[in-house]
C-alpha cells in the first residue's frame, strides 16, 4: 500500500464515518423534528434589518416582515441604514407609514448597525434579518416554541436560496440545503456554531447581560454563536422555518463571500479556542469543531491528489498517442466489458458516500418543505464543489495570515448581482 493509498483511505473513512454518524443522529431524533407549539401568550419581538446600499432588495425584505403571521402590536421592525450612498434610506423611510422605525448612522459595518438597533429594541426577543433576504409568513411562530426551555438563547431558521439562475447559484442551492440538514443535526448534538444573519431569533437578555455584537469580526453570526456556547447556553433549530437569501450569482462574488465566512470562522475559533478539544463543551469541542478543521485539510489533500492523478494520466495518454503517431482509430475498436469496472474498496466507499449524500439532500428537502427541482443542481455540486471549497479555504487562510480586510463595509452590489436580486 502506497502513501497515497493511506491518505485516500483516511479521507474516505473520515468522510463516510462522519456522514453515517450525522445520518444516525437525525434518525435517532426523528420524533423531535416537529417544532414545539408557540406560547399561547405571544411575546413582543423586534426584527432588525441592517442595510448598506441595498436599494434593490430592501423593499422585498421589509414587505416580507410586514406579511408575517404575527400580531402587529407585538412586532417591532427596525431598519438601520449604515451610511448607504444609494436610495436605501429613502426606500426605508417609505415604510415609516407602516410603523417601521428607521435609524441611520455613518457607515461602520453590520455589527455597529445591529448594536444601534439593540438600543432601540423593545421586544423580549430580537431578530436580525439581512436586507437581501425574505422570510415566510409562518417562520417566526415556528421558532418561538423552542424558548420554553430557559437554557435556549437562540433559534436558527432554515436558510435557503431563492430561485437559481446561474451555475454558481445552483451549486449554492445544494450547499445551503446541506446547511439545513447539518444545522438540525448540530442542534441535536448541541453543536450549532453559526447563527445565520437571516432571521435567527435571540433572547434580548443575552445582549443585555453579555454585551452586543462584536464589531471587530467580519462574521458576527459565528462570534455570537460561539459566545452562546461558551457561556453554557443552547442554540436550537426550526428546520421548516424558511428564510430565502439571494445567492451570489458570479464566481467572484461567491468567492468573496465564502472567503469572508471562512476567515471569520478562523478568527472566532481562535478567539474561543478554549472550546476546542474540551470535554466541557461535549460534541462541539470534541468532534464538530475539530472535524471542521480536519475536513479542510483532507479536502485539500484530496483535491491535490486528484489533480496530480489527472495530470499524470493525461500525460500517459498523450505519450501513448504520440508513440502510435496519434492513430486514434484503434481506440474505436475498444470493446467494453463488465470486468473493467473498478471494484476496489475505495470505489465501494465512494458509492456509499454518494448514496448518503443524496439521502442527506432528500431529507433536507423534505424537512424544510423545499419544492424546486434539485437534479441539475446536485450534479453541478458533486463535480465542482470540492475543488471550489478547497480554493475558497486556501484564499481564506491566506487572508487570515495576511490579516486582509474581507468585510463588505460600504459595499455596493455589482450589476450582475442586481440582475438576480
Predicted regions mapped to residue ranges:
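Juxtamembrane C-terminal module of membrane proteins
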Residues: 24-43, 275-286, 316-421
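Long helical/loop segments within the catalytic core of UDP-sugar-dependent glycosyltransferases
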Residues: 106, 111-113, 123-124, 137-217, ...
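Short, acidic, metal-binding catalytic loop of nucleotide-sugar glycosyltransferases
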Residues: 63-74
